Amino acid sequence: SKAAVVRLSLENDVKAAYYQAVYQAERLRVLESQDSLLAQYRTLAEKRYKAGETRQLELLSAERLQRENKMEVLAAHNELETAQLLLSRLVGSVETVEPKEDSLLPLDWKQASYNYSQTPDGQYSADRLKASEQAVRVAKNGFAPSLSLSLRNQLVISSWNPYDQDRSRFDGGNFMGFEVGVGIPLFYGATRAKVKAARKEREMIALEIKEQEQLRQQEYLSALSRMNAAYVRYTYYNEEGRERSDKMAEQGLLEYSQGEISYLEYMNVLQESIDLRLKRASALNDYNQCVLVMEKLCGRQ
């Protein structure tokens, strides 16, 4: 039914907004953890500068990185609030909706072949086609003869005549009878026009359904391709990039504090570390959003 199509679309919109809020919360956590590392970097740079071990340029670079990251944190806060406002509006709440997940995780998806007829869109289309076929049958009824049935009866109470009426015309006494009439249409022009219009409407609906089925099939294949690509990216950043990012941040701070690498090298390490973590979150969000699109196309809730 149309209600099922609308309900599925609304539920999918809510899910998409919810997991977008979860993603924005994950980005905020990454940036806030990076802010902690940059604060340590700035402290070390300041100590080394005061001790005369480095030039002021190193301290200025550390301060710049920390300020830039704080601006990114502020922007992430705003993006999270925007996502939460959208989610609150979709669920009809006046309060801010907080994601319950502490971290961004991949959604479950079981691969299945696409069958348009089993989706809410397909079922609604089938209902529309049945209704159009019924309209054709109703229009054809105008060619058939019409039957009418009426009941006639007479009841005379001989002992009661308060108005002293002449009852000679009722000498037949009491009786009950039926009358049956048959109406045969003599002109079929209007009926033919109705049948033609109903058939045309049925053909248009059938063509529209066929086009929609092809479009949904293309959307499914496109979404499947995007989902597989996003999963490959997520797998890399989750299995290799995440571990590498953590090791880079820890090892870089240790080597910099011991003077084994320059501040420029450490800046590159920090930048690559946060890029890997943010790319992991972005790839995972892309994958989850693709899963939600697949669920909507397949009619899953």
Could you say what each language-model-derived stretch is?
Residues 21, 87, 125, 149, ...:
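Hydrophobic/aromatic residues within transmembrane alpha-helices of membrane transport systems
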Residues 3, 7-120, 223, 230, ...:
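Periplasmic alpha-helical coiled-coil/stalk elements that build and connect Gram-negative outer-membrane
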Residues 161-169:
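Flexible, solvent-exposed loop segments that connect beta-strands
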Residues 68-93, 244-300:
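Short segments within alpha-helical structural elements
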Residues 1-7, 57, 61, 140-144, ...:
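Sec/SRP-type N-terminal targeting helices
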Residues 153-157, 184-188, 298:
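Transmembrane beta-strands of outer-membrane beta-barrel pores
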Residues 91-156, 161:
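Amphipathic alpha-helical coiled-coil scaffold segments and their short linker/junction regions
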